[in-house]
Amino acid sequence: MTKKEQSIWRKEMLALMNEDADWYRNEDTERFKRIQELAKKIETASTRQFSSHISKERFEAYQRMGLQFKEIAEEFHITTTALQQWRKDNGYPIYNKNNRK
């Protein structure tokens, strides 16, 4: 996905949202579904784009230094969501409140 495609998707999504300020209230509409679809495409494209900037060596070095995941994401200039997706894609364990060790 190119930045140009992401820009087009963003513009379409914003136009759909601007046409109906209450678009989010009815999940059964085509507008709601299209906005959700575009948001997912944009998020996925962003995650893929940023994942190429992350190296396992640097990630593991930051972990050894004791950095939190939020701090590691900041070091890579990505969101915590993008870092979490990268971790999933690269076989690192994902913890949540219910399965922390």
Curated annotation (Swiss-Prot):
This is Putative regulatory protein PrgT. Might be involved in the expression of prgA, but is not required for activation of the expression of prgB. It comes from Enterococcus faecalis (strain ATCC 700802 / V583). Keywords: Plasmid, Transcription, Transcription regulation. The lineage of its organism: Bacteria, Bacillati, Bacillota, Bacilli, Lactobacillales. It comes from the Bacteria. The gene is prgT.
